[in-house]
């Protein structure tokens, strides 16, 4: 601890000598707060496979113009080793300092003689992935902290195929970043100068319309029954997906009512506890609006437009679905559509993460397609799609339990815009068949099995929290529960040692005959996450298995 304290105070002094303006004032206010100085300076904000993610503020362990500039200089050095004249697209969401950080990154890249395409307005993450592919750039950056609380921001890097950087590339970029001093090594030129010299070009409406044209063509090709369309209430949760979600739903002929209070950018997310469509609280105003207009479907996207949550009006009561349930319905719906209109072929495939429901496996088997699995994180799904793109195997659908979905070939990251359209089209087809989504899901369970899932997270902040998370993971590896309920432990999979073709990762999977229990530290938050996956013969049995797994988790975290 003494070495950590010494390092933190040495770096604090270095920052005091070099920063100015508001950040200098913020530093001076910390001078008597040892705990805060240690938390802000005990390490560098890590550039992991999620890029940078952290609280906004001064410090080496915070998101600010210095950490952004250093990361971007490292990224520039990496790119210039790959290619002589690289180019990069940069997008940003509605969070505090997102535009500032995007401009900082663009000025650093421009100073390194890298051509930058910078969005002239907020843009969702899937549009960034699309733009990288459309403009054939060598990479992309999006400034976002997704659905984290308002005090956070982040910085994600994309490779030339529009996929978020997987560990191989992230590690190479990290190696370049770690060579750099925060204050001496980052090149930068003024924004206006870079615009004048055409090192920075601004992207405007055309790329939005190109995206809408692309996904509209795909969606109309599904030839879904849309005789009856639900009235839709939509909230972007103050985020960047508003223009594209309303744009595609309008093109498809849906009547959409907005939650006006949440439709203008607000970096404080004022009416929300957290801007996360996985949370019931995020739907409070949307459900109020839905009752007023008698909406059949309620949609919410997160601030960077890559995740979506839904509610359905079921006999006058609004009920929600998990990310797994929506993924199962969309999988079955799309497979039906592909079989109906374009004949499925051997080798066609669905992609999901290891922590996502196994219910799609019997569905895929019936349709004669393959289920490919990846580690947690949509970047691995994007990587898998890219791997098979020239193999003759057709990508049908990819999803993860955390409310992220992708269909079509336009992007390589989860896309709440195309998902919003697909969910609305699927709901329309069900209505045209005199069915609700709830009834559709019930039919699927009766046919394919009563699978159940639950995510349980524990938050442990700061240095002490990181140590606690390490102890919990060690316990899962070395001393896991030998029984859950009446079921013996069959197998322990430690992905850190390397499992099959999966890259090494700090993930442990415990397999029991009807239960899977998977633990991993979050890559973007100070949390450890446990995923319970069960396969019951009835709904009641599935719920009982989940309860027994929860008891086992309580035992594991008690270290």
PLM segments and residue spans:
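Phosphate-binding and adjacent anionic-ligand microenvironments
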Residues: 291, 296-297, 337-520, 527-531, ...
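Gly/Ser/Thr-enriched, mixed-charge loops and adjacent short helices
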Residues: 14-15, 19, 36-45, 155-282, ...
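An N-terminal, well-structured beta->alpha segment
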Residues: 3-105, 112, 194-230, 240
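Active-site phosphate-binding/coordination module
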Residues: 127-185, 303, 314
């Amino acid at each position: 601890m003494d070495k950590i304290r010494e390092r933190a105070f040495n770096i604090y002094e270095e920052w005091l000598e070099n920063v100015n303006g508001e950040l200098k004032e913020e530093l001076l206010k910390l001078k008597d707060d040892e705990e805060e100085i240690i938390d802000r300076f005990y390490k560098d904000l890590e550039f992991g496979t999620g890029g940078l993610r952290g609280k906004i503020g001064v410090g080496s362990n915070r998101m600010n113009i210095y950490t952004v500039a250093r990361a971007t200089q490292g990224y520039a050095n990496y790119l210039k080793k790959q290619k002589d004249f690289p180019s990069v697209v940069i997008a940003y969401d509605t969070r505090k300092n997102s535009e500032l950080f995007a401009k900082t990154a663009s000025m650093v890249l421009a100073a390194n003689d890298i051509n930058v395409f910078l969005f002239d307005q907020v843009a969702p993450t899937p549009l960034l992935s699309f733009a990288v592919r459309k403009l054939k750039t060598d990479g992309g950056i999006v400034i976002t902290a997704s659905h984290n609380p308002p005090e956070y921001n982040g910085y994600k890097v994309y490779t030339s195929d529009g996929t978020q950087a997987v560990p191989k590339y992230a590690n190479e970029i990290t190696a370049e970043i770690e060579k750099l001093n925060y204050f001496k090594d980052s090149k930068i030129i003024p924004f206006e100068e870079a615009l004048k010299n055409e090192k920075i070009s601004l992207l405007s409406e055309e790329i939005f319309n190109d995206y809408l044209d692309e996904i509209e063509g795909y969606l109309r090709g599904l030839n879904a029954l849309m005789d009856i369309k639900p009235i839709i209430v939509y909230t972007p949760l103050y985020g960047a997906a508003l223009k594209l979600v309303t744009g595609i739903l309008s093109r498809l002929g849906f009547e959409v009512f907005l939650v006006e209070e949440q439709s203008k950018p607000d970096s404080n997310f004022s009416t929300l506890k957290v801007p996360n469509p996985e949370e019931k609280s995020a739907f409070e105003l949307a459900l109020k609006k839905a009752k007023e207009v008698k909406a059949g479907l309620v949609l919410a996207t997160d601030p960077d437009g890559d995740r979506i949550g839904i509610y359905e009006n079921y006999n006058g009561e609004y009920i929600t679905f998990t990310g797994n349930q929506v993924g199962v319905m969309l999988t079955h719906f799309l497979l039906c559509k592909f079989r109906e209109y374009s004949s499925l072929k051997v080798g066609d495939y669905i992609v999901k993460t290891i922590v996502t429901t196994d219910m799609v496996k019997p569905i895929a088997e019936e349709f004669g397609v393959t289920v490919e699995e990846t580690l947690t994180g949509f970047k691995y799904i994007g990587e898998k799609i890219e791997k098979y793109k020239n193999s003759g195997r057709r990508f049908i659908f990819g999803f993860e339990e955390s409310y992220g979905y992708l269909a079509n070939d336009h992007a390589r990251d989860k896309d709440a815009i195309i998902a919003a359209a697909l969910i609305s089209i699927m709901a329309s087809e069900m209505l045209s068949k005199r069915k609700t989504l709830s009834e559709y899901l019930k039919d699927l369970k009766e046919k394919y099995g009563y699978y159940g899932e639950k995510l349980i997270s524990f938050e442990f902040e700061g240095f002490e929290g990181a140590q606690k998370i390490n102890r919990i993971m060690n316990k899962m590896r070395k001393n896991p529960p030998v029984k859950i309920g009446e079921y013996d432990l069959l197998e322990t999979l430690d992905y850190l040692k390397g499992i099959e073709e999966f890259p090494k990762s700090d993930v442990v999977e415990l397999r029991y005959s009807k239960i899977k229990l998977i633990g991993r530290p979050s890559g973007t938050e100070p949390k450890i996450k446990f995923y319970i996956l069960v396969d019951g013969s009835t709904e009641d049995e599935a719920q009982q298995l989940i309860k027994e797994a929860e008891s086992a988790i309580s035992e594991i975290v008690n270290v």
